[in-house]
Amino acid sequence: MDSQDHKAPGFVDIVKSWIPRKSESSNMSRDFWMPDQSCPVCYECDAQFTVFNRRHHCRLCGRVFCAKCAANSIPSPSDETKDSHEEPERIRVCNYCYKQWEQGIVPPDNGASIISLHFSSSPSARSVASTTSNSSNCTIDSTAGPSPRPKMNPRASRRVSSNMDSEKSEQQNAKSRRSSDHYGHVLDSSDNQVEFFVNSSGRSDGEADDDDDYQSDFAQSYAQGNDYYGAINLDEVDHIYGSHEAHDVGVKIEPNISGFPPDQDLDSLNTETIDKTRQQENGWNDVKEGSPPCEESFEPEVVDFESDGLLWLPPEPENEEDEREAVLSDDDGDEGDRGDWGYLRPSNSFNEKDFHSKDKSSGAMKNVVEGHFRALVAQLLEVDNLPMVNEGDEEGWLDIITSLSWEAATLLKPDTSKSGGMDPGGYVKVKCIPCGRRSESMVVKGVVCKKNVAHRRMTSKIEKPRLLILGGALEYQRISNQLSSFDTLLQQEMDHLKMAVAKIDSHNPDILLVEKSVSRFAQEYLLAKDISLVLNIKRSLLERISRCTGAQIVPSIDQLTSPKLGYCDLFHVEKFVETHVSPCQVAKKMAKTLMFFDGCPKPLGCTILLKGAHEDELKKVKHVIQYGVFAAYHLALETSFLADEGASIHELPLQTPITVALPDKPSMVNRSISTIPGFTVSSAEKSPTTELRGEPHKANGDLTGNFTSSKTHFQGKLDGNDRIDPSERLLHNLDTVYCKPPETITSKDDGLVPTLESRQLSFHVEEPSVQKDQWSVLSGATEQVTDGGYTNDSAVIGNQNFNRQEQMESSKGDFHPSASDHQSILVSLSTRCVWKGSVCERAHLLRIKYYGSFDKPLGRFLRDNLFDQDQCCPSCTMPAEAHIHCYTHRQGSLTISVKKLPELLPGQREGKIWMWHRCLKCPRINGFPPATRRIVMSDAAWGLSFGKFLELSFSNHAAASRVANCGHSLHRDCLRFYGFGRMVACFRYASINIYAVTLPPAKLYFNYENQEWLQKESKEVIKKAEVLFNEVQEALSQISAKTMGAGSKGSTPNKIKLSLEELAGLLEQRKKEYKDSLQQMLNVVKDGQPTIDILLINKLRRLIIFDSYAWDECLAGAANMVRNNYLEAPKNSAPKVMGRNVSLEKLSDEKVKSIPTHVAICNDSLLQDADYETCLNQGKSFADTSGKFAIPEDVGSDRPPDCRMEFDPSEGGKDNFVESSQVVKPAHTESQFQATDLSDTLDAAWIGEQTTSENGIFRPPSRAASTNGTQIPDLRLLGSESELNFKGGPTNDEHTTQVQLPSPSFYYSLNKNYSLNSRKHIMAEDRPVYVSSYRELEWRSGARLLLPLGCNDLVLPVYDDEPTSIIAYALTSSEYKAQMSGSDKSRDRLDSGGSFSLFDSVNLLSLNSLSDLSVDMSRSLSSADEQVSQLLHSSLYLKDLHARISFTDEGPPGKVKYSVTCYYAKEFEALRMICCPSETDFIRSLGRCRKWGAQGGKSNVFFAKSLDDRFIIKQVTKTELESFIKFGPAYFKYLTESISTKSPTSLAKILGIYQVSSKHLKGGKEFKMDVLVMENLLFKRNFTRLYDLKGSTRARYNPDTSGSNTVLLDQNLVEAMPTSPIFVGSKAKRLLERAVWNDTSFLASIHVMDYSLLVGVDEERNELVLGIIDFMRQYTWDKHLETWVKTSGLLGGPKNSTPTVISPQQYKKRFRKAMTAYFLMVPDQWSPAAVVPSNSSSAEVKEEEEKDNPQAVGNKS
């Protein structure tokens, strides 16, 4: 092989010399090629090299390949500048390197940027223009490619500390102008100069930038030294913006240290290079981090003046120096003043002229931050039982942790590039070293890890080392498990490793860090080169070192062309031996070896070393200090942002320590959470606020009110809490301080906020529950602030308590806040284009984790999203100024609009962002809100989390409700402006209405307040009574006039006159008592009862009719007596007492032989029966066992005097009391009554028995007299029967006439005997003589009052034009009761086992309504399951499904035959037992109705409403009725189970379907209709908008939107969404979706479609009242045809759009999707952690998973 290889070497060399070759660039040196002699075969394919198969070296890795394996070429990464027209040089590479180049690992430049990482630093650079520098003589060198080997070994010089004396002296000079103060809340304008480096490792656009990156940072590492580790001082806390004085850096940096060319300084760099660098440094546009999708936005209406461009013009600057342009040659001098280590700088280095509002807020800020942070750390230590104060010689942990936390936070400036996170927790590591003292704990400005050098002879301590980081392994084989021939392997490996080490050594590194293993040969070669090796380093640790030192990670040795080295001040390895051993540990002492990279130039990481305790205690301290660092960092940023905004906070007392319960300490359940009294910091909901421990506020001039937050602590089980990173735990624990619901202020008159000791934080509760004190937060769903009388959105709370609490209870197990919920904010984001009037991105939910991967710095958000003029909207292609962005959260919306200015704002090249605001509440200046002076945003404010910025904007607690200089709320009352270049963004907060969702209630609510129609009815009754009494009065006057004007021919004229006077007195008394009693009844109101009961009014009307008949008969009798006494008459004929023979004849026909003349009654009305409705509902018998009326003892004294009129010549004026056995003797005329044969009948009747006369006519129940005298009932109440008894007293020879009102039994007989089956009824054809006007008025009303009494004597008049009155009467009829009872006696709620007496013993004044007697009918059943089983069982027989009731009325309006068919009678009755308080309420409501012109429908069917608005009556078509007959059993089952299991449902309950028919026998008029009775979803509501939604916009638009009761459709809602959106809370949205999901699944299962969601917007209560209606239609063949016609477009309309009528499954999907999109969810504390955007297809996915299982969805938590 060798002979072939060297066959003709001379000839080959000669031929090669003839071929012209281009000169190799320095980085293509053949020194790093594999020797030809050691490579006889191809590295890749093992092909033997011959004269014809020549060797080819890869120009990148140096290995030898054949022509086939090295046939690729790439552009040469040469440093030489090429002309634009000249093609770039190409070099040969192997297949492996070519693939690496294609994948982007090897960039097409000089290889310096091995991994291209986009990043940027904080761009504010506000001090560029205002800073001068004297350090322009600083020389900056740069070298391209590998550094030439210096004369003196650089590694040797860095190992001798004495060689650095000159640098140290320069360090002291720089140090004298810097402070050692590290107070953490002071924030630095970190980029106050033009920097020639980037803020993160791994990015370079050129070699000069690579080395410049090191130079700037490295040069300042001298000046900074250890001056970051001084004591924390609060004296200069107010100096936020820092000094911009010149800082001389007079260090002449040696070329062998800096690596810069000696002939290039800062002045030689042109402006273009600086601009390019600034754009690279500040231009976040390089990072195309995709923001989450947006949804359509709803911006509140802006005021008119906002459209005026003058409003957007920036005001004058506060500091004129900020407007000066930068002097580019001086930029390098700012490096030391800037402090490249983090935002926070020593406070005494600030220039007072740059501090804004320092006089007002400095003291408050200092006290707030210092006191709050120390209190937080103290309580964290207290929770872990760690010593806080000094113990002997040992210093307490409180001061140590406070100092270390602030120091670590000071050193941080997180890389906010795409590759770096914002979370400071990822940049701080804590190491526990159980030795030394506590005071020896320190912060290392760099990386500390458990590693050691690979060889003991390698140097372990190097000052100013150069670090080279190599990824992968340093081995020969670059591909795992590759096979080679053994004979060449060893030689090739040694040659390759020599080449690799030589390549490494060419860059002069002091330390080589390798990710994986290193060959033993390579280790020996590195030792010989005096390069310290550290191998097997984890990738994460390698990246940390790279980030802090600035070194780039070279992927492999093949790409090691021009790497970027890292630097630090000191590299050393130390070994620590444990001196503190915990009691549980073995006595053996352990050793720990740590490697230090101290003094790193990048502010991207530090390490805290904890000493002075055993391992267990240090772990606890580690836990606390991780919290402390994050809190300090976060407080610092927010404090700086607060200062930039010019806000002020109150200086509040710091007396009570706070308590924080740690999530990983579940055993300590007694850890309460309280706060510092009267104090809140600006960290919004993530910082502790204040609370009083039940003691009054101490006098404080700055304390104007109590602060409270909306954040509610929670109970719930957290899994894996120990895995939560420290920043998450800290944010959560800071959140737990904000756990007072609004009721803590509103419920206390003395203004004290109770402690939260009773609201303990528990993370391990087996069954998550909501504590009682949290309900106010849920029901209010708002946050309150009481600060000097300033309250936000407090009016919303009271109107939402009931419904929101109901929603909370209905879904207690849904979503409870977890630890992750408190470290992020969930907002709804939307974007719309104003220029085009289109929605670019629909509203969607976006969760931003604070300082997380999806978060952005505030400044970067402004630059990328709002100020980038090159970025256009992908939806509408319009620029940023054409759009409005809207973020909504809780009770507010933040609207962001952008405009372009006519002139540039200063400082665009330096990245200056200007801030100012205009107060909307201050007096206008020239018609515009006054503006503050504009200032430049500080770097710390620039780096504030945008998520936290949003939280501050939305929060209502005191930390966010900061006060501007004018005294108004900064976020609520001011327009906030941010400007950059020509662009200005305006942020405006506006309160929004968040609606609660109200589903149809399971138990219907009946409003018992006075209703207008009831008032009208009661007035009509009074009017009719007055007409009656006036007529009686007139008749009495006429009769009396006859007695006065005619001569007496009788023997007792005086007695007759006296009797008439007594009758007149009785009339006046009755009139007065009637009015007084009725008025008293109307004025006495009881809860849950009708103030005016229509059933009482009906009974009164019926009784007045009987009263009119009695008075008419009485007056006729009186007139006959006058005629008999004063006129000539036969002596042997007795007077006709009853006056008219017609009535007596009809009574005789009814087999009423006599009327008892002396019936003892109580002074109570029939309306007073205490158990009236109870009888109706439970079937009680109210006849006592003796069959007698019981007389209450307490009313005996109120019994009125006897009201009879009698005149007896023998007895004079003495009352004649007759025993009950006495009867009126016949006076030889047929007009006298015989009563002897009625005694037994009446007794039986009163007890409740029924008798039938000989001719089959129903005999009424009656009652025998029980006392020895005639008692007229108490007439003080109109409700009493007007008992006008005519009584004929016994006489011997001379006849005696006694005139009395008829006894109660007379009217009772009339009530029971009044049967329209008899054409000879007394009153049906009666023509009144004396009360004709009243009778005419009554008949004219159309009420048929003389129908037989219903069950339990209910009086329900029938109106021919009101079908519900026919239904109501049918439901109370005995025929209906008999059909309903059947064989199932237990379900009989209208039992008639006992007769209901008209005159019971309970005083009417004790009752105001029949509702006192109502009993929930569901009590008669054992359980809901029994109801369902019985209900289904009864449906097995068709004859049991429907009940048919017929009756006839022969009243004065005419004879009519009525018929009512009750479909599914028993099932509906069982449903009403569950849904209605009682059957009586249902019947009472149906008693009256009115025709109603319902809008929105197209069916043109009959609609009616019950007069109390409780029910809707809708005509049902034949098809709908047939459909319901089919799916009726499924409907009853679904609705009953939903109610019993409390599963959400939005179905509007149908409580009955009836067929009503009537036929007038005269004229033949007929009426027949099928109707359903449905609950009125809009009962007792005032709606501003009403929608009927089907989920389709096709033909769903109502152009008439002006009417008050106009029903709007889908397209109307879609059009209104941009301007008047409907916002709902997260729980309300989930409740709505669950209900709709359940109902649509059920409706689809029974093949129902074309239903609608009726939505009423109640702005008074902030509620959405909704329910699904019109679900009676199944998808039958006609609907199939309609779908086809509408789809084809034969009858008009778009052909491609989906019709409104589609299959049930398609309808369900479309309906769900639309209802989800129509109602926008505003995130709140109940929002789930994982959010699915509203416009996603998740509904369809869930549908397949839970198909046809709506109950599972409803019950799932």
Swiss-Prot record:
Superkingdom of the organism of origin: Eukaryota
EC number: 2.7.1.150
Keyword Metal-binding: yes
Binding site for Zn(2+) 2: 58, 61, 94, 97
Sequence ranges assigned to domain PIPK in this UniProt record: 1395-1719
Compositionally biased region (Low complexity): 1729-1739
Tissues showing expression: Ubiquitous with highest expression levels in pollen, seed, and senescent leaves.
One term of GO molecular function: ATP binding
Biased composition (Polar residues): 134-145
Binding site for Zn(2+) 1: 42, 45, 66, 69
Biased amino acid composition, Acidic residues: 317-337
GO annotation terms (biological process): endomembrane system organization; phosphatidylinositol metabolic process; pollen development; vacuole organization
PROSITE patterns the UniProt entry points to: PIPK, ZF_FYVE
Coiled-coil residue spans: 1014-1087
Pfam family, one: PIP5K
Region (Disordered): 125-193, 276-297, 313-346, 684-709, 1729-1757
ZnF (FYVE-type) intervals: 36-102
Cofactor: Mg(2+); Mn(2+)
GO CC field: endosome; endosome membrane
Inactivation phenotype: Leaf-curling phenotype. Root growth inhibition, root gravitropic response, and hyposensitivity to exogenous auxin. Fab1a and fab1b double mutant displays an abnormal vacuolar phenotype late in pollen development leading to inviable pollen.
Subcellular location: Endosome membrane
SMART domains linked to this entry: FYVE, PIPKc
Subunit structure: Component of the PI(3,5)P2 regulatory complex at least composed of ATG18, SAC/FIG4, FAB1 and VAC14.
Function: The PI(3,5)P2 regulatory complex regulates both the synthesis and turnover of phosphatidylinositol 3,5-bisphosphate (PtdIns(3,5)P2). Catalyzes the phosphorylation of phosphatidylinositol 3-phosphate on the fifth hydroxyl of the myo-inositol ring, to form phosphatidylinositol 3,5-bisphosphate. Plays an important role in maintenance of endomembrane homeostasis including endocytosis, vacuole formation, and vacuolar acidification processes. Required for development of viable pollen. Might mediate recycling of auxin transporters.
Name the UniProt record assigns to this protein: 1-phosphatidylinositol-3-phosphate 5-kinase FAB1A
Natural source organism: Arabidopsis thaliana (Mouse-ear cress)
